[in-house]
């Protein structure tokens, strides 16, 4: 009897974890077929965000910490959304930094400038000047924001993904092309990461 009781005590946390999150309330199953696959079988977490979103800024550092803790257990990708006219420039800024292998440097700087310093960077010229101030050649920066089919294609691809997954609020996350959640569904930053952990395990 005692052994059975001990066994039940060990099972209880797992059972509680399994029933803690409710489909349709805390997360949604992606109804349509996936558009991409992760070839190395590592769970793929796609964050939909914008530098223009204050909540995206608030969770950016915790999200980076979470991704670091996950290590090889998950792969984080970011997709900038375009909900407002100037967010198109923010999407171009993200892909420009990524193309130049400057994402780790530029992401926090762009977030801080727009969210804390209240510098909207709402024109092509202001974005070009901003990138130049942080070490990018002016002609390269100008080309990225004014005439880059590659950058434009990546922005459009991101918008297609946004529509595909029916993203209407950010920050939002798609886990392994199977499940979707966002900060609004989670209700808090702490709970959001708990849900992401749960969905990573569930999708494996």
From Swiss-Prot:
Transmembrane segments: none annotated. One of its GO terms (cellular component) is periplasmic space. GO terms for molecular function: disulfide oxidoreductase activity. InterPro entries: DSBA-like_thioredoxin_dom, DsbA/DsbL, Thiol_disulfide_DsbA, Thioredoxin-like_sf, Thioredoxin_CS, Thioredoxin_domain. SUPFAM superfamilies: Thioredoxin-like (SSF52833). Residues 19-146 form the Thioredoxin domain. Keywords: Disulfide bond, Periplasm, Redox-active center, Signal. Disulfide bonds join 53-56. Residues 1-18 form the signal peptide. PROSITE patterns: THIOREDOXIN_1, THIOREDOXIN_2. It is found in: Periplasm. Involved in disulfide-bond formation. Acts by transferring its disulfide bond to other proteins. Belongs to the thioredoxin family. DsbA subfamily. This is Thiol:disulfide interchange protein DsbA. It comes from Legionella pneumophila. The lineage of its organism: Bacteria, Pseudomonadati, Pseudomonadota, Gammaproteobacteria, Legionellales.
């Amino acid at each position: 009897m005692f052994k059975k009781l001990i066994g039940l005590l060990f099972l209880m946390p797992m059972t509680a974890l399994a029933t803690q999150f409710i489909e349709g309330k805390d997360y949604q199953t992606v109804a349509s077929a996936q558009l991409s696959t992760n070839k190395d079988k590592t769970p793929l977490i796609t964050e939909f965000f914008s530098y223009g979103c204050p909540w995206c800024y608030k969770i950016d550092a915790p999200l980076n910490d979470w991704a670091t803790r996950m290590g090889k257990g998950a792969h984080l990708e970011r997709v900038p959304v375009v909900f407002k006219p100037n967010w198109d420039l923010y999407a171009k800024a993200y892909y420009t930094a990524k193309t130049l292998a400057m994402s780790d440097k530029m992401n926090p700087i762009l977030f801080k400038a727009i969210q804390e310093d209240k510098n909207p960077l709402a024109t092509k010229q202001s974005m070009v000047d901003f990138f130049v101030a942080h070490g990018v050649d002016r002609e390269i920066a100008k080309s990225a924001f004014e005439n880059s089919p590659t950058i434009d294609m990546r922005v459009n691809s991101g918008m297609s993904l946004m529509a595909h997954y029916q993203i209407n609020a950010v920050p939002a996350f798609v886990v392994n092309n199977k499940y979707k959640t966002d900060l609004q569904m989670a209700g808090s930053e702490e709970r959001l990461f708990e849900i992401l952990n749960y969905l990573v395990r569930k999708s494996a």
